[in-house]
Amino acid sequence: MERPQSSIWVFMLLLFMVLLQSPAWHVAAQRCPQTCVCDNSRRHVTCRHQNLTEVPNTIPELTQRLDLQGNILKVLPAAAFQDLPHLTHLDLRNCQVEMVAEGAFRGLGRLLLLNLASNRLSTLPQEALDGLGSLRRLELEGNMLEELRPGTFGALGSLTTLNLAHNALVYLPAMAFQGLLRTRWLQLSHNALSVLAPEALAGLPALRRLSLHHNELQALPGAALSQARSLARLELGHNPLTYTGEEDGLALPGLRELALDHGSLQALGPRAFAHCPRLHTLDLRGNQLTTLPPLQVPGQLRRLRLQGNPLWCACHARPLLEWLVRARVRSDGACRGPRRLRGEALDTLRPSDLRCPGDAAAGDGDGDEDEDRPAGPRAPPLRSPHGEAAWATPCPPACACVAETRHSTCDGRGLQAVPRGFPNDTQLLDLRRNHFPSVPRAAFPGLRHLVSLHLQHCGVAELEPGALAGLDRLLYLYLSHNQLSGLSAAALEGAPNLGYLYLEHNRFLRIPGTALRALPTLVSLHLQDNAVDRLAPGDLAGARALRCLYLSGNHITQVSPGALGPARELEKLHLDRNRLREVPTGALEGLPALKELQLSGNPLRALPDGAFQPVGRSLQQLFLNSSDLEQISPRAFSGLGKGLRSLYLHKNQLQSLPAPLGLSGLELVDLSGNPFHCDCQLLPLHRWLTGLNLRVGATCATPPSVRGQKVKVAAPVFEACPGWTARKAKRTPTSRGSARRTPSLSRH
């Protein structure tokens, strides 16, 4: 009776030993990190909130889903997940990640979802996302990204959703999303975007939904948006837009839904959406619209959302109501006034219900059509050039003044003189696209609260002395695209707290140095695309607080030593697209805070030794692209150390380049578009590149046998060079001390 029972125990023991040797059991029992939970049946591993500082190296190889939320990884090194080739989902939320090294995700060719939300990323280096050819969804929400470099997403050809919401983006460069051929939804909400380059959205042929709500767009970027030809849904709510019209150039043939809700819209051009033939739903809730013109859109518009606007249901709204009925468009707005119609739904009214004082239809004598408006006492309706009514008191004729936002606008009204009579508490005054050849003395009386003044495209040729009198709080002055050739200190005396002065696209031949003496707090001066030919001592004598100086696109041939000296706080200097034949090294003396130097597009041809020595300790970004560079001295970058983050040398004529040793902090180097001659003279550069964990784009143009090969990997060309064997020997312990060690610029 005992033998069968003994046989059973022997069988179970043998079975246990077999299972113990199986790969699955071995993985489950031996490879699960102690701080993690491994579910081998579903191939899930969870290591949440374990204070991990690096990715555990004993995670089962067959894992498909890895959850590392809430750890302290900070840096993701190259090949951090190379032992997990089967991963499809990777969650790295709230891991305090500050840097992703290039190649961090290489080997994850099956990954579908990468979640990097709620970390501390301020930049993404090129090649950081290499190896993710199957990725469908990338979450970068809630980081600290300030810029996007073209090419960052170039390896993500399968991506369908990209989430960049809740970052710190202020600008989208051209081709920012190049390579995203299948992306259908791009989320950019809750940033600080104010400018989109015209080609920013080029290269997104499949994009169907774009979220740009909660940004700082003051004008509709129609040219940029129209690049996304397949867009069906566009979300632009919660931006400080005050007006949009056909001139903004929005042309989206497939657009079905457009959200412009909760902005500052005061007027809308009748043909603003004339080039969106399939538009079905237009959301204008929560703006400052008192009425709308009949919109000239093709017949597919079916819903117009107007809730939360101060609609004034008087005779001026009849064309709108008649159009809504005729076009069979449903609307949900309600009347703010007059009193007898307050709270009435717009779509329940008849045209005869909308009347003004003196109308024959006003037979009941109630006399309330001209009663109190939201902005104050009674005033007649104000008309914009497109026929919209705009109610505010006081306010000059043909302008619109909104009490809630303290904004007043006369944009594009055809005015020949600066109007008067704006509300005394106005903070933003928009007078763009009128015709004021001269701005007279005391042109803005009573506007002591004014913060931002827009005078672009007004044909201004002169600001008379005292023109800005009384504008003690003015911070932003926009005078771009005018006819100015000079400015006097007397003209600016009334705005002593001005911080930002925009003078681009005028006729200046010199920096208006005398005028700057009246602006002791000026921090940013824009003089792009003028005709300035030189910078001389004294030009910036009054600009001691200046931090940003933009002189791109002028005719500058000389920057004299001492010309920039008074601006010791200067952080950004843009001298690109000028006629400089040499780096103005002497002029860089005395700029201890300079971080960004833009010299691209000048005919420099050569860089001598110590060209940037004066700003070596502070400089972080150096732009030398498209500068006809043919020769760079071996010590051209001497003085520049680990503080330099970006070096742009692309699109030059360099056949050779000395290795810029000592630049250990580089995060971006661009050497593309140079005709490098790959011979022994280039060996130092080859060595430097092999120790540099960055994508630089340097390729061989000659000899023909290696044309098109990357300098970094073209080792066969250099194997016969003197010194090549010494490099190989350097790797062995016996020769380590005798061979000179090449510094590595790897970021990890």
Curated annotation (Swiss-Prot):
Signal peptide positions on this chain: 1-29
Keyword flag Glycoprotein: yes
Protein family per UniProt: Belongs to the small leucine-rich proteoglycan (SLRP) family. SLRP class IV subfamily.
Organism annotation: Mus musculus (Mouse)
Residue ranges occupied by any LRRNT domain in the UniProt entry: 30-61, 394-428
Name recorded for this polypeptide: Chondroadherin-like protein
Top-level taxonomic group: Eukaryota
Gene name per UniProt: Chadl
Domain LRRCT positions: 309-357, 674-722
